[in-house]
Amino acid sequence: RFLQYVAFDTQSDPNSDTYPSTAKQLILLNHLLEEMLRMGLEEVEIDAHGYVTGTIPASTGCEKVPTIGFISHVDTSPDMSGTHIHPRIIESYNGEDIRLNDDLVMKVSDFPELEHFKGHRLIVTDGTTLLGADDKAGIAEIMTAAAYLMDHPEIEHGKIRIGFTPDEEIGRGVEFFDVEKFGADFAYTMDGGFEGELEYENFNAASAKISVQGRNIHPGYAKDKMINAIEVLHDLHALLPATQRPEHTEGYEGFYH
């Protein structure tokens, strides 16, 4: 499933005024809709904003168990290409540096977390695009679990709600998400770090777009007249606390970036 999902180009676009920000996200969202219908899930739908939801009904006798939700986003970061992805499978990782292509190497010294995956099967890119594991790995996990539960009705569980959203990477993922309609008592986003981790709090951020209009004057006549927009922005950036940057903060410490 994962390799199938990453073949879809689902980059979001922070400069778009539409929702979803790119129409190509809807291609994967509709694919997931059809897949859930084939599995036999109930209440499967896509709304006007592209949110896809579905239900695995509760087992007999478990109707009063709290409803659990699982959510993932379909979009990938606009910072790097998501087109023509070429995944490569490393069957048994040897714990050494991974050469993605002739020019790019994932060094264990730069990514020490690789040491935890020696002997595991890894999926990497050819270094020219994103892989899209954020968050198509989460989608694959949810859909695989859903298929398993639908195929094994002997496993007792309460009502399970599934949701797939667009535009998370550009900070708009839940802009129109109807929490009440989703109807979960508890919900988990399958978009995280190491196996076994459970994050019970979330990161919040706000962004600002600042434009400076300079004044261009011939350098020979510029005294007290020229305004260099780059210098103004540089001065503004210098006013931000130097110790409150991502490279100097951790935990609950906020930062400017």
Could you say what each language-model-derived stretch is?
Residues 98, 105, 114, 120-133, ...:
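Midchain, well-structured core segments that form catalytic/ion-binding scaffolds
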Residues 28, 134-141, 229-232:
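Catalytic-loop motifs flanking and including active-site residues across diverse enzymes
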Residues 51-55, 159-176:
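Beta-rich nucleic-acid/ligand-interaction surfaces
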Residues 32, 141-149, 233-237:
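Buried hydrophobic packing segments
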Residues 56, 79-84, 173-174:
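Short, conserved acidic/polar surface loops in the N-terminal third of protein domains
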Residues 63-159, 164:
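Active-site metal-coordination/substrate-binding segment of hydrolases
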Residues 1-23, 124:
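N-terminal capping segment at the start of a domain
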Residues 17-65, 69-71, 75:
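A non-catalytic alpha/beta surface segment that caps or lines the substrate-entry region
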